[in-house]
Design a protein with these regions (language model features):
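Membrane-proximal lumenal/periplasmic loop motifs of glycosylation machinery
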Residues: 82-92, 105-128, 142-145, 149-150
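Membrane-interface alpha helices of multi-pass inner-membrane proteins
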Residues: 178, 228-249, 260-263, 281-288
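Transmembrane signal-anchor helices characteristic of membrane glycosylation enzymes that use polyprenol
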Residues: 60-91, 183, 282-298, 404-413, ...
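Perimembrane helix-loop-helix junctions
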Residues: 215-217, 221, 254-285, 357-381, ...
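Short acidic/glycine- and proline-prone juxtamembrane loop motifs at membrane-interface regions
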Residues: 92, 116, 189-200, 251
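Transmembrane-helix motifs of polytopic, lipid-linked glycan transferases
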Residues: 146-168, 206
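Transmembrane-helix signature of polytopic, membrane-embedded enzymes
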Residues: 159-183, 201-202, 229
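Membrane-lumen/periplasm interface segments of specific transmembrane helices
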Residues: 268, 275-372, 401-416, 470-486
Length: 820
């Protein structure tokens, strides 16, 4: 078969650019349709007396310089954005990826990794060398983010290269495409963390580049060993790229499936090949088997056999199991989530998603219609007598790739989210954008090519408007009730998952509750933009002008606004929050960093805290216990325990010594005599077991309280109070207050953040000391607080507030205070 019937309607008299491959007539080799690059010819100049020497192209306008400039500018943007990153923010996603790299450097963080899900390993391989050259964990994290930037900066370069080499787009227009597709908001924002999003964004473009290289290699019909080697090389690399995508994250099975189906669709419907079949499918099979072995090994050593439920998270097996086990009464979640995903696609692209859908689907349909006409001899002919198709076969292949990969990721993401355990509690579940938006630029690119080639009519613009209107109507009918809920549950929002639509919420913060009004505002903005496109298209029809700049430049500006808005409102804020969360853990563990004791147990800490503890102190062995029962079930005594202050573990054991109370936030406990003796040798002040105590210097208070030496001085109307704490069992407890004028205090003892009062009895009050007792009836009483308020006209001083448990037994794992 030849490509004679598949030429684009381009100027046949234009000269190919320097470095272009072949000519229009040479693009018809079996399996190929790689067109040369053409510039629009300049108007003929009047004849001169002597022919002018050809003008040499400026190096600053050459393709290689523009690609270099795109890379440098993009990298500079990524580097600047990296300056606000500090520490893990999205856990366990980031931590799990980093921990795999740490494992290959000799660190075993399995005790903390196994508490979270499996998220893939391929991107972790790029982080392995960081541990060779950088010792400081904080710097390690930032270098990893810089690696993300180095990788992602290739995206606009690949987009430019494909636009120029494959589709013959002019230089300036190719730059516009590179900015829109290669600097897409998701590419800039989601790559500022050490999760797997970087390669999820980049690998589709690597695969597209290999498509071009493979099609180009088919032009060599000599069947020489060199030609065959090239064809098999590109095919094998493409297959391995698909497997690498799946090894990066489970959802990328969508790209693997799309790549395989693409080869078959092109073979059966176009009678062509994208890749050499043997090399492509062999590499997919071999790579998939290798991935299964590597994944199994890492899941075994890091996610542990006894945590198999966690190791299976984010795998296709887990998703299929959840789908087949779905509650029949909850099947409505699938159409709700599917429509929500379409809503996100259209909205986050400021309406261009609807245009892309219309152009890709109509482009494929018209390609086959005009192709069939050409076979029957009824097609329009070019000046040299060759039949024209609506779009070239190469563009049709890319449209198929975009259509298949978008369809596959929608299926996978809907499967993940419609069966999610947080469907009823998270407002972002049905409109979850993070999984799908990494592929949006792949769909935008062929649509821009078609607009550039004049394949965007008034009917296309109207169809996009109608499509968006239909999707939005279904959104209001199906998705909005699922997102907003019935009012009985306050649904939370994880902003990172829906960043693309946050600028359209108009006046609402990133974490504000999503309401019906939120949807109305987003829909109104997008429909107004699509209506503007229709109007502009009607005007340009009369003037016979192109729509490319009218669409690309405003869309690029709006997408840049999305990036800036989300960077300022989310990335910067989360960088500060991550740093704040790591400070307390760091301060606590720095107290014992040089002790020689490396066995630390994190009790009932949130994942964002214990993963930071392990990452910031990589040589320590951090293990977990979320409840007293699990703490008692430990087979060995840790050297130290870190816990949230409100847990007050020293109340529950007679052999735990409180080493430090870090900013009323984190408690550090010594668990063995050896650890306790080391603390004493270092001059660290230890609190007695089975109690906790505030001094007048550190007890929390209202603003009017002053400090005098070791006492808190309370003027009339002021108060001191304990932080909220938990009581993990029933029994008797005693508060001992010391100071002057204590009998003038109004005492309030409450639980559940002041919702309930706890009865108490003052058993003694003399000589500057007051003792009150109370009983906890429940097995667990949360958010208990003692508040002392001065209601009299005279000042009251408080020097200490101490709580003790009346009856204390050692923890099972701490049977004797003589333990080493």
């Amino acid at each position: 078969m030849t490509g004679e019937n598949e030429l684009e309607n381009i100027n046949e008299n234009a000269a190919p650019l320097e470095g272009a491959e072949g000519s229009a007539g040479s693009s018809g080799a079996e399996g190929s349709d790689v067109h040369p690059i053409y510039e629009v010819p300049k108007p003929e100049e009047p004849e001169a007396s002597a022919p002018a020497a050809p003008k040499k192209e400026s190096v600053f306008l050459s393709d290689w310089f523009l690609m270099l400039a795109l890379y440098v500018v993009t990298l500079a943007i990524h580097v600047l954005m990296t300056q606000v990153t500090t520490m893990f923010n999205l856990t366990p996603d980031e931590y799990a990826v980093t921990a795999v790299a740490a494992w290959f450097n000799g660190y075993d963080w399995s005790q903390t990794v196994s508490a979270g899900g499996y998220y893939g390993y391929f991107q972790s391989l790029f982080y392995i060398p960081v541990f060779w050259f950088v010792d400081d964990p904080m710097l390690q994290y930032r270098v990893m983010i810089l690696i993300n930037g180095v990788l992602m900066s290739f995206a606009p370069v690949i987009v430019y290269f494909l636009a120029r080499k494959w589709f013959g787009v002019r230089k300036l227009s190719s730059v516009f495409m590179a900015i829109v597709c290669g600097m897409y908001p998701a590419y800039l924002l989601l790559t500022k963390y050490t999760w797997n999003e970087t390669l999820c964004c980049l690998l589709p473009w690597v695969f597209a580049l290999l498509m071009y290289k493979s099609l180009k290699s088919f032009k060599d019909t000599s069947h020489s060993s060199k030609a065959v080697f090239r064809q098999q090389l590109w095919a094998a690399l493409a297959g391995l790229t698909l497997v690498a995508a799946y090894a990066t994250h489970g959802r990328m099975i969508a790209m693997l499936a799309a790549g395989v189906v693409l080869e078959l669709v092109v073979l059966f419907t176009m009678k062509r090949k994208v890749f050499a079949m043997s090399g492509f499918f062999s590499s997919v099979v071999v790579g998939f088997l290798a991935d299964k072995m590597i994944k199994g090994y890492l899941q075994n050593v890091l996610w542990l056999k006894e945590q198999s439920d966690k190791a299976s998270v984010n795998t296709i097996e887990n998703t299929l199991g959840r789908i087949f086990d779905a509650d029949p009464e909850k099947l409505m979640r699938f159409p709700q989530t599917l429509v929500g995903h379409f809503f996100y696609f259209i909205s986050s692209t400021w309406g261009f998603g609807a245009i892309a859908m219309v152009l890709i689907i109509s482009g494929l349909a018209m390609y086959y219609v005009t192709r069939n006409r050409a076979k029957k001899g009824a097609a329009e002919l070019t000046a040299d007598g060759r039949a024209k198709t609506y779009i070239t076969s190469s563009l049709a292949m890319f449209c198929w790739f975009a259509f298949l990969v978008m369809g596959a990721i929608f299926v996978v993401s809907v499967g993940f989210k419609a069966t999610s355990t947080v469907f009823d509690t998270r407002a972002d579940t049905t409109i979850f954008g993070r999984y799908i938006e990494t592929f949006f630029p792949v769909a935008i690119f062929p649509a821009l090519i078609m607009i550039y080639r004049g394949r965007f009519s008034v009917m296309h613009s109207l169809a996009a408007l109608i499509t968006a209107g239909g999707i939005f109507a279904l959104t209001e009918l199906l998705t909005v009730p699922a997102v907003v809920g019935d009012g009985t549950t306050d649904k939370g929002v994880v902003s990172a998952m829906i960043l693309g639509i946050t600028p359209l919420k108009l006046g609402e913060g990133l974490k504000d509750k999503i309401t019906e009004t939120t949807f109305i505002k987003i829909i109104a903005v997008v429909m107004a933009l699509l209506l503007a496109v229709v109007i502009i298209r009607l005007i340009t029809v009369k003037k016979n002008s192109s729509m490319f700049n009218w669409v690309t430049i405003p869309m690029g500006a709006l997408l840049m606004y999305t990036s800036l808005y989300c960077f300022d409102g989310y990335t910067v804020v989360q960088g500060k929050n991550a740093s704040y969360g790591g400070e307390y853990v760091s301060e606590a563990l720095e107290m014992i960093d040089d002790s020689g004791f490396d066995d630390v147990l994190a009790f009932s800490l949130k994942s964002e805290r214990y993963v930071k503890a392990q990452f910031l102190f990589p040589d320590m062995h951090v293990r977990l216990a979320s409840t007293l029962k699990k703490l008692n079930s430990q087979t060995a005594r840790p050297d130290f325990i870190i816990a949230d202050r409100e847990d007050n573990l020293q109340l529950w054991s007679g052999d735990l010594w409180l080493v430090g109370d870090v900013n009323h936030n984190i408690h550090l406990y010594a668990c063995t005599n050896a650890a306790r003796e080391w603390c004493e040798e270092q001059g660290l002040e230890l609190s007695a077991p089975a109690s906790f105590e505030y001094s007048g210097r550190n007890i929390p208070s209202t603003s009017s309280v002053t400090r005098d030496g070791g006492a808190a001085v309370l003027p009339e109307g002021s108060a001191v109070y304990t932080n909220y704490f938990a009581l993990y069992s029933s029994g008797g407890f005693t508060f001992t207050l010391r100071g002057t004028g204590l009998e003038q205090l109004s005492i309030a003892l409450t639980s559940d953040k002041k919702a309930n009062s706890i009865d108490y009895e003052i058993v003694s009050s003399d000589d500057g000391e007051m003792v009150l007792k109370f009983n906890a009836a429940a097995a667990k009483t949360e958010n208990v607080q003692l508040k002392l308020t001065n209601r009299s006209g005279s000042p009251v001083t408080v020097t200490s507030v101490k709580l003790t448990r009346d009856s204390v037994a050692p923890l099972i794992i701490l049977p004797a205070t003589t333990a080493a």
